[in-house]
Each structure stands twice: as C-alpha cells, then as structure tokens.
Amino acid sequence: MTENKAENKQTEKTEKMEVNIIIISDSAGETAFNNAQAAAVQFPDAEVNYRRYPFIVNEKKLAATLEEIEQYPNLVIVYSMLDEKLQLPIIKFAREHKARYIDILSPIIEAISQTTHMKPTGLVGANHQLTNKYFNRISAMEFAVMYDDGKDPRGFLEADVVLLGVSRTSKTPLSLLLANKGLKVANLPLVPQTHIPNEIYQIDPTKIIGLTTDPQVLNRIRRQRMISYGMDPDTAYSNMDSINAELDSAMALYKKLGCFVINVAERSIEETAALIMNHLSYEED
C-alpha cells in the first residue's frame, strides 16, 4: 500500500499539464514571445509549448493560422496586431474554442488614450502613415534575424528575396543591408550533400539569388578566419579541392533553380546589394 502511494505521488510529480502558447503577430512577434516566456517561467510544473506565427499581415494568413492551431489543446493565444480587422477573428476564435487570449497592445494604447484624452484609432492611423518606412525597415530587420542561416524554412516562402551561398559569401551581412532597405530577406548556407529544403523549389526563381565567388578568394577568406580564431588554417574548410567542390555543387543548384547568380569576389556588400535591388526592380522608399 505504501509503495502504491509513493508511485502515485511520483506519477503526479512527473505528469505535467500541457499548455500551448500561440504567438500571433503582424511583425516578428518578439515582444509577445518575450512576455509569454516571462510569464511561463512562473509555472515550472507546466509543459509549455510555444508556437510562433510571425508576419500575419492579412486575413488569409490569419485564417490559415487559426485553422492550424485548432488542433492543439489548452490554448493561450498571445497576439500583437495593430489592425482591428485582424484582432476580431482571433477573439472570436478564442471564445468559440474556450481559449484564453491576451492582447499585448490594447491595454497600453488604452492607458495612453485615457492619459492624453485622445482617441487611439486616429492617432495610430496617423502615426502609421508618417512612419511607415521606419516600421517596414524594423520589420524587415527582425525578419532577417529570424530567418538567417536557414533557421526556419517557412521564412523562404515569406521572403522578398532568398540568398543562397556557401560559407563566407557574405550572406548574413548582405541580408541585414537589404533589410535596412526594407526587403524581407532569408538566407540558406549551402553545404555539399546536405538536404535542400523543399520550400526552395516552391519559390519564384526570380526571388532567389545565388552567391558565388572565386576559389582563391574564398580560400584566403577562410584561412584568415581560422587564423583569427587561433586555429590551424590548413583544414578541409580551406582546402582548395573542398572549396572547388562546394562552389561546383552550388552552381549546379543555381542552374537547376534557374536563379540569378552574383560573383561576390572583390565586391563590397553595398555593390552586391545594388545588383540584387536592380535585379528585383526594387526602389527604396
């Protein structure tokens, strides 16, 4: 009898209540996610799952998101949306599915409204119009960080441009520079004999940029990088045969995709960015 009680107590300790926290945002959702995390640490005995849905900017994307999360039990929806048209479906969904929901922005907007005796609807509209360029850049920068280095294949489908390239072809700094121009950029490092995400083949080839370089230039850059880390510069990473194989593999993929290719050897990232923007016929606001 004593053993059974002990086992029951042990089972109670190991079984955790599952909570699915859904983060929905019209931007990267970092604020909503950070708030959810800060709250969730107060419940160490709960099994908390975070499911993030960033850049939900229209009703179609929101509908798909709500349809997807319907499968999860014990929902807590944390959302950050400026557009009321996108807030209402979330509230309706939450009520119909008996889910808890938290609006990150409205309490702050309401507090400012009460303090200033101003109507938030007019203020938000005017502010958005005046600072649209700024917010687009911030959103693009957050996007570039979130989808850097192939972290999440879903980003490829949402991006304005996707950069492909072997290691040390300036993918990340180029992504950030283009993001500062207002473009949503995702990038993927290419390594021979590794799986290419299916999403890459679903993208319009005109949105894909294949980065390449000269073998000797890449060899020099990689050797210098190893030396800066206090490591042996003569490794497979900087070996000319390996470099040639990597570049050949990348070029074969670019040919298969039919994408635009840029040789970044001896080019500044500003020059490369200009070539990409010209290719996309993109003009900065």
Curated annotation (Swiss-Prot):
Q: Which residues bind ADP?
A: G165, V166, S167, R168, T169, S170, K171, T172
Q: What class of enzyme is it?
A: transferase
Q: Sorted alphabetically, which keywords does the UniProt record give?
A: Kinase, Nucleotide-binding, Serine/threonine-protein kinase, Transferase
Catalysed reaction, written as an equation:
N(tele)-phospho-L-histidyl/L-threonyl-[pyruvate, phosphate dikinase] + ADP = N(tele)-phospho-L-histidyl/O-phospho-L-threonyl-[pyruvate, phosphate dikinase] + AMP + H(+); N(tele)-phospho-L-histidyl/O-phospho-L-threonyl-[pyruvate, phosphate dikinase] + phosphate + H(+) = N(tele)-phospho-L-histidyl/L-threonyl-[pyruvate, phosphate dikinase] + diphosphate
Pfam families, per this entry? Kinase-PPPase
Q: Does the keyword Kinase apply?
A: yes
As recorded in UniProt, its EC number(s) are: 2.7.11.32, 2.7.4.27
- Single GO term (MF): ATP binding
- Write down the InterPro entries for this protein, in alphabetical order: Kinase-pyrophosphorylase, P-loop_NTPase, PPDK_reg
What PANTHER family does the database record attribute to this sequence?
Answer: PYRUVATE, PHOSPHATE DIKINASE REGULATORY PROTEIN 1, CHLOROPLASTIC
Which family is it part of? Belongs to the pyruvate, phosphate/water dikinase regulatory protein family. PDRP subfamily.
Function statement = Bifunctional serine/threonine kinase and phosphorylase involved in the regulation of the pyruvate, phosphate dikinase (PPDK) by catalyzing its phosphorylation/dephosphorylation.
Q: What is this protein called?
A: Putative pyruvate, phosphate dikinase regulatory protein
